């Protein structure tokens, strides 16, 4: 597999009407890694942006690193390939560079993304992610995807996958929520010790939850010292931990700003101060799934 570019554009919560333009701006800026998922319901528009830049001759398909994710309602082995080809078709691609299991939990199959019972809790499927993984491996063998990985797996789940008998294709990354309020020190150290890279989603936190990470005084002070924005500090923080990072933006100015993180370095003290902000604050906790047998966040890490 090609090495995953360390910086990518996240497309989660990017409205279909604005994501095509965002992708085009990002490619012009220099982004080559795009993080997508069936769940985001905007892969079609992402694909339009990618295709436009290929047609213009700005990039070739082989210059790009495109990631998508298998949604929880498609964990049944017989559903994996059609889920993948659906994303490929939407993105207008012949292959994906990387395909991830979005969550370790299988949900009841069907058209509803979040099937819930009367009490509003997720309805599980009786699937096991080790079986789902075998269908993921088939996608690599068939050439539909170049590499496979996981997302939102805790270390016990990842260990179970890595120790699977007859594992044919290893997961290349574990994509997890990560920012200074949720530093994921133990999980990152575990993944890296097992040669599984880590990709950080929500690296800038999320003000929608009333958690204005970007306004944190410690981060602000470091930003002022370097003449950089708080967002640039948070992105650089992950890069210096050897963590791949996928900030989401549809704002052309911020798409550019988020990419300008290779011309400065955080000091050891900066890194220590940022790691010191950890408060185990998880923004993507998925509470309606917490009764699921494979819910990942009951384990310490």
UniProtKB/Swiss-Prot annotation:
Q: Recount the known activity regulation.
A: Inhibited by p-chloromercuribenzoic acid and alkyliodines.
**Annotated binding of substrate, by residue:** 102
Q: Which UniProt keywords apply?
A: NADP, Oxidoreductase
Name the reaction it catalyses.
1,5-anhydro-D-glucitol + NADP(+) = 1,5-anhydro-D-fructose + NADPH + H(+)
Binding sites annotated in the UniProt record for NADP(+): 35, 175, 246-258
**Gene3D superfamilies given for it?**
NADP-dependent oxidoreductase domain (3.20.20.100)
Kindly give the InterPro entries that the UniProt entry links to this protein. AKR, AKR1E2, Aldo/ket_reductase_CS, NADP_OxRdtase_dom, NADP_OxRdtase_dom_sf
Q: How does activity depend on temperature?
A: Optimum temperature is 37 degrees Celsius.
Q: Which GO terms describe its cellular component?
A: cytosol
**An example molecular function term from Gene Ontology annotations:** 1,5-anhydro-D-fructose reductase activity
At the top level, the lineage of the source is: Eukaryota
Active-site residues, record numbering mapped to chain: 40
Q: Could you tell me how activity relates to pH for this protein?
A: Optimum pH is 7.0.
Q: Which CDD domains match?
A: AKR_AKR1E1-2
| Enzyme nomenclature, EC number | 1.1.1.263
Annotated site (Lowers pKa of active site Tyr), which positions? 69
User: Member of which family?
Assistant: Belongs to the aldo/keto reductase family.
Describe its partners and assembly state: Monomer.
Free-text function comment from the UniProt entry: Catalyzes the NADPH-dependent reduction of 1,5-anhydro-D-fructose (AF) to 1,5-anhydro-D-glucitol.
Name of the protein this chain belongs to? 1,5-anhydro-D-fructose reductase
